[in-house]
Amino acid sequence: KTNLIDLTNPQFPLASGDQFIEGDRAHRFEVLDGNLQPVASTQFKDKTMIISVFPSVDTSVCALQNIRFNREAARLDKDVVILSLSVDLPFAQKRFCAAEHIDNVRVYSDYRDLDFGMKYGFVIKELRLLGRGVVVVDRKGIVRYIEYVSEIKNEPDYDAALKAVRELK
């Protein structure tokens, strides 16, 4: 695709917000759905959440990340939900999801308040984007896996995140 953004240079640090470690209690956060309506993380309290975090649907690695998690979502139990979060406007997210047939994950925007990004330490302050990573939160609200991808051009470790979910059984 020719409309993709290149974020590979320079490196941007994840400078804003607290970073989590496995075993921490997950914070409640609020993001926006495709109709600009707020969605609270507590809506998924009885499910295991895989939170896929990425800068923008208009980058090639982010597209790959969403496509991969969409494919994986179809193979997971019904008590697992994948949330895909960026600061893209919901309209751009809808366009991307339609074009790439993303229909097994729930794509939400953190653009308004950076609520998730600030609470989980994923904000790239200089760009007002989210960094790349994955968070797994169990049904009890405990972070069971977290990855902050240090090189934004790299994909997250999908296998490690999915293994963490399987081990919750």
Model-derived regions: residue spans:
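Chalcogenol-based redox active-site neighborhoods
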Residues: 1-169
